[in-house]
Each structure stands twice: as C-alpha cells, then as structure tokens.
A protein has these predicted regions:
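Non-catalytic C-terminal accessory modules of carbohydrate-active enzymes
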Residues: 1-132
Length: 132
C-alpha cells in the first residue's frame, strides 16, 4: 500500500473503477475490508495508520489504534476490541457501528497461533460440506 498508492496524480494503481480502488485503500488502511459482498463480515488485515477514528451517523465513534505499527511491524500479534482479546479474523458490521475501540498489537513476525479456531474463520474461508 505504501508503494502502489501515493498522493500524486498517478497515485492509484490501475483503473479507479467507480471509487472501488479508493474504497479498498481506505478500508485496508484501517485494517479490515468487506471481502465477500452480501455478508456482514469485514476480513482483518494490517492497519496502515497508527490511529484512525471513525465518526458514525448514530453519534458513536470507533477508534482504531496500532501504535507499534511500522514498516517492519506489519503483522497482527494480538487484537483487542473494547479492551477484550479478540481472536476472530473478521469483524461484524453491527459490531463496528456500536463504536468503541479496536487495538492492534503489531509485530515483525506472523502469530501462527492467533485466529486458528473454526469459530475464528470468516464466512469466505468456511468449509461448506455441500460443495464438492
């Protein structure tokens, strides 16, 4: 994201299809993105910023922090939602609209133990026994 997107006339990679590339960038920079349209899940990534605040129409705010984020600390070691450890690899739309805090603890190595339970997997990665 730091290499392909810049604040210049040619700062977007590819074609800006009706704002989709910009929307992808904004969501991804916050650390999550709606990968599977039609679901209420946002898949986790790694935030670009150390802090971002979303102000919702309902008057609530969502503060997203990744204070130890850097070019080398680009992996999520731990995540807390409203102070509670959060192991899922997705966030739900209604949870975001409630406001509160999302704190990413970033590290220079992937945490291979985080988010490995079946309940931590998002819809788009779930196993469907009907599909063969």
């Amino acid at each position: 994201m730091r290499e392909l997107y810049k604040n210049t006339p040619a700062g977007l990679c590819g074609n800006e299809d009706c704002g989709q590339m910009s929307a992808w960038y904004v969501f991804s920079a916050m650390g999550f993105y709606p990968v599977c349209p039609g679901t209420d899940e946002y898949i986790l990534g790694a935030p670009l910023f150390k802090k971002a605040t979303l102000h919702f129409e309902n008057g609530k705010n969502l503060v997203i922090t990744a204070s130890d984020n850097s070019d080398t600390n680009r992996y999520v070691d731990e995540m807390r939602v409203n102070g509670t450890v959060y192991t899922k690899n997705y966030l739900k739309h209604n949870e975001l609209l409630q406001g509160g805090t999302i704190d990413f603890k970033m590290t220079d190595r992937p945490n291979m133990q985080r988010g490995t339970q079946e309940s931590d997997l998002p819809y788009s990665f779930s196993k469907d026994e009907k599909v063969k």
